[in-house]
Amino acid sequence: MSVRKYGAAYQGSKSKIANDIISLLPARKYLIDAFSGGGALAHCALESGKFEHIIANDLQTKEILEAHFLWTPEQHLDFQKKWIAKEEFEKTDSLYIKTCWSFSNNRKAYIYSKDCYEYKRLLHNAICFRNYKEFEDYCGIDLSEIDSYDNLNERRKAARRAILKALKPYSFKEPINSNTHIPKEIYDAILGGNKDWRNLQSIEATKQGKGLVSIISSENLERTKYSKNVESLIQQENLLRSKSITASNISITSVSYDEIDLPDPSETVIICDPPYRNTQGYQIEFDNDKFEQWCIDKAKEGYEVFVCEYNIKNPAFEEVWSKKVINTGGGNKNQKRSIEKLYHVK
């Protein structure tokens, strides 16, 4: 069962739990998403119909929010087709490029390693520009069968099927857990540009349990970056447009949370997903004590204030919801389990 994705690909996104959170907020004329990040909560709120207007604010991610909510489908398509080389990634000041083309959207490390860079570049060109011959000359896999598809997303899916079909004669199931594997020798040869990889008869030797790569791990051969990054953007863009969501429904601002121009308290709900206390990885220093006092002050003024956090000890914050989640930043090997909580300021 596929999970609905909200917002742009962004480290720390609330996409998986956006529905849970938005469903608990009272309906008002305005929703203030004070730390919008990739816009997952704002996106979900737009589709919920509970709010007439949403202000998506973030001190750092205005460029990402504008791309996600305000770009046309044509702009998204152009961005999908553009290959960003490592050199350009390292030089650019574009936060959007840094996010979409970085490993686990961390905006630091380029998405592809040296070992698979050329393979990924040629796969991208085959899918986006129909340069099948260059890809086949590099790794010996013919993708011309995807030519009948015009939709870019369908072409990616067809390319994945074609690559898996090419690998099938050289894969086998492990007796113990029935996981499907291919020999690592073949995996490395394809990424490295050895188009004669089919002549590497190492399957029998690797059946003994050495030098295996599971088909799940070998998705590096099948996938371009779009699985978690740009691919979701075009789908979300089309969904937004289909609901006639326009600039009249959402405003994007880029100020500190305590500088947001707030509407009347009786008409406004504030949702905050700030940098969590005692966690690392944020680009700026954040004063959690100051933030919590601001929330208390706003609640005293009559605003409905909700905060996402792992744990808030201040008694003014009442826990109203919690859920165990799995964070997969950095891939399946780096899964971390945590309990997300939503607090309401009394």
Q: What residue ranges belong to the model's regions?
A:
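Glycine-rich phosphate-binding loop signature in dinucleotide/nucleotide-binding domains
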Residues: 25-27, 263-268
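Short, hydrophobic beta-strand segments that form beta-sheet elements in well-ordered domains
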Residues: 33, 54-56, 304-309
